[in-house]
Amino acid sequence: MAARGRRAEPQGREAPGPAGGGGGGSRWAESGSGTSPESGDEEVSGAGSSPVSGGVNLFANDGSFLELFKRKMEEEQRQRQEEPPPGPQRPDQSAAAAGPGDPKRKGGPGSTLSFVGKRRGGNKLALKTGIVAKKQKTEDEVLTSKGDAWAKYMAEVKKYKAHQCGDDDKTRPLVK
């Protein structure tokens, strides 16, 4: 408990002393009385037990990080190429490889990364294209296609009235 009021500092550094006492921090640490001007402050004493995170930066600002990153990526690519490609597995083996918690998930981080930027499902989810059969025109539509604009309009009105309104009470059914 000799360094009760001090913060943990890296080797070779001196903790800043109390205000007005240049280098007074070591004076309190050397005295065995355990009294310091900050002895009533529990927060400071708790901070002395945990190390201060202010370590040395591992990467200089000269592009060395990029070099290390490229090397790491090349190593990962080599590891992927060296691994044997997964052959056809029996259904009981694939379930065991997937794990007990998630039956759809396959082992390894490579399988999840292979879906990034790609459509999932392949041809199963693609829309079917082709020739769509045309609907046969009814007799009314055939007659109105020959007539003038007024006849076309009246035929359309009849068509909507047939679906919407009842002639007996002139009301239309509720629309959900």
From Swiss-Prot:
This is Telomerase RNA component interacting RNase. One of its GO terms (molecular function) is RNA binding. Residues 1-12, 68-83 have a biased composition (Basic and acidic residues). GO terms for biological process: rRNA catabolic process. Exoribonuclease that is part of the telomerase RNA 3' end processing complex and which has the ability to cleave all four unpaired RNA nucleotides from the 5' end or 3' end with higher efficiency for purine bases. Part of the telomerase RNA 3' end complex which contains about 488 proteins. Keywords: Acetylation, Exonuclease, Hydrolase, Nuclease, RNA-binding.
